[in-house]
């Protein structure tokens, strides 16, 4: 009997695939089975690099969805642009040696990760404007000043305390005004899929909130373990294609 057979926990850890960009994209799209998705989400919570990859994927999905809904943008992306997005995603994946399927997750170099995310955003910005790339750039209307310098804002956080989150469990979920998108069960299922949860996941509590002056809906669902709750602040139009995720956290049930 092998050491892995004697130690089920070690065998399970060895059998888990590395947290690659492709695997995390499948998680985000709801393509994994329930058991695998739960294991991956649990590993992501303790892996800052995997969390960084998921944030980059979410940003790209939001940017591309926003461009598709904006009439100011040109026609649909050309195949070459789509290929560029795929190449940028692959560039964020670390090289691995053959036969390492059961090894620990390969290290994602921070510089390469950041460069890949930046490339994704740059490619997303190019969608719909391929026909005008040869046009001369407009001259600046005024010299660059300190007013044009932007600074990074801290990541949004869930504005409710743990007791407030737990209190939502005792009330009927409120998805916003009647007729709102998330009031439709099929739309909620799509939203949960975009968050990486199966359609059977129950919503234990919900409430409209504002985060950084942006409207959102707070969703409380079971976490990966029975003693915890997963809390997500998503856009009112949340769907599998674009969750509009603004913030998330995990709180203990008791």
Curated annotation (Swiss-Prot):
Q: What is the protein's given name? A: Anti-sigma-M factor RsmA
Its domain comment says: The cytosolic domain interacts with sigma factor SigM.
Gene Ontology CC, one term? plasma membrane
Instruction: Provide Cytoplasmic-side residue ranges.
Output: 1-112
Recorded name of the encoding gene: rsmA
Q: What keywords tag this UniProt record?
A: Cell membrane, Membrane, Transcription, Transcription regulation, Transmembrane, Transmembrane helix
Membrane topology, as annotated: Single-pass membrane protein
Q: Which residues lie on this side of the membrane: Extracellular?
A: 134-254
Membrane-crossing residues?
113-133
What organism, scientifically named, is this protein from? Mycobacterium tuberculosis (strain ATCC 35801 / TMC 107 / Erdman)
Self-association or partners: how does it assemble?
A: Interacts with ECF RNA polymerase sigma factor SigM; this should inhibit the interaction of SigM with the RNA polymerase catalytic core.
What does the PTM comment of the record read? Probably cleaved within the membrane by Rip1 near the cytoplasmic membrane interface.
Q: What does this protein do?
A: An anti-sigma factor for extracytoplasmic function (ECF) sigma factor SigM. ECF sigma factors are held in an inactive form by an anti-sigma factor until released by regulated intramembrane proteolysis (RIP). RIP occurs when an extracytoplasmic signal triggers a concerted proteolytic cascade to transmit information and elicit cellular responses.
Q: Does the keyword Glycosyltransferase apply?
A: no
User: Subcellular location, in the record's words?
Assistant: Cell membrane
